[in-house]
Regions:
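Conserved N-terminal subdomain of the carbohydrate kinase-like
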Residues: 1-78, 249-254
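Short glycine/serine/threonine/alanine-rich loop segments
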Residues: 19, 103, 237
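Conserved phosphate-binding/catalytic region of the ribokinase-like
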Residues: 96-100, 147-254
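Glycine-rich phosphate/pyrophosphate-binding beta-alpha loops
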Residues: 33, 54, 79-81, 228, ...
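Conserved beta-alpha-beta core of the PfkB/ribokinase-like small-molecule kinase fold
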Residues: 73, 79-157, 173-175
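Glycine-rich beta-alpha junction loops
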Residues: 41, 52, 111-113, 141, ...
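A non-catalytic, amphipathic alpha-helix used as a structural packing/dimerization or gating element
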Residues: 9, 93, 127, 131, ...
Length: 254
């Protein structure tokens, strides 16, 4: 019952937020995967109940191809690639459909070593990066994946793999927006952080939403910096996500 309730909670949340969930499908028997997040002075730790979850059973033939083909942006997290081989294949197929339809592909290199080993993760992520228009890695994940420490070196690395735009998330240090011709470090928005569980995903969504609104990558990065920072001022990955008005007001205040 817990897992069905979690699935119901997602659908209720999406309805409340006005999201189109018309193409969401429910597996008749498989549970909804659940992540547990614990906090300590050293940060947060994830534990998962995802084995044989509905998401892990995703396969290419289950994709809403027409829906993906009509999108302006298609976003994929490496976590979706990590949970199973069939989900990995579905991610590959979805990227191909999106690219053929003219969508821009964005990709977060989310590294979860409880889901796959580093060598497998690195190989798949490096295979995916050249297929992306917008790369949204974090500094910590990238240091593990590339063996590099410096943010500029990491940006060069991913640009060299073929991604034309890299927005490198650096937590309390802000972000680095990089293309083949420019590097811009955007300072962080200062807050008293409580829980950074959803900060990376908040940055991704905020950055992409502003690109869809017509912002250039620098303006989108400034907006996303603020949104991600505000999302750390409460507990959880969803509840603290700020509304657009709150982000714009924070930007006005500087």
């Amino acid at each position: 019952m817990l897992f069905r309730s979690m699935g119901d909670a997602f659908l209720d949340l999406w309805k409340t937020e006005g999201l189109d969930a018309s193409r969401v499908t429910r597996h008749p028997t498989a549970p909804t995967g659940v992540s547990f997040v614990t906090h300590s002075a050293s940060g947060h730790k994830f534990d998962y109940l995802r084995k044989n979850s509905a998401a892990s059973l995703m396969a290419p033939d289950a994709l809403p191809a027409d829906y993906i083909a009509g999108a302006r942006f298609f976003h994929l997290s490496a976590i979706g690639q990590a949970i199973s081989e069939s989900a990995r294949a579905a991610g590959d197929a979805a990227i191909a459909i999106a690219r053929k339809g003219g969508a821009k592909v964005s990709y977060d290199t989310n590294l979860r070593l409880r889901l796959w080993d580093l060598d497998t993760a690195r190989a798949k992520i490096n295979e995916t990066v050249p297929l992306c228009d917008i790369l949204l890695p974090s500094l910590d994940d990238s240091q593990h994946l590339t063996g590099l420490e410096d943010a500029d070196a990491i940006a060069y690395y991913y640009l060299g793999l073929g991604s034309p735009l890299v927005a490198l998330k650096m937590g309390a240090e802000g972000c680095l927006i990089a293309t083949q011709t420019s590097r811009d470090r955007l300072p962080p928005f200062k807050v008293t952080a409580i829980d950074a569980t959803g900060a990376g995903d908040t940055f991704d969504g905020a950055f992409l939403s502003r690109l869809l609104e017509g912002d250039d990558p620098i303006a989108a990065g400034r907006y996303a910096n603020v949104a991600a920072a505000l999302s750390t001022t409460g507990y959880g990955a969803v509840t603290p996500i700020p509304r657009k008005e709150a982000v714009l007001e924070a930007l006005r205040r500087g």
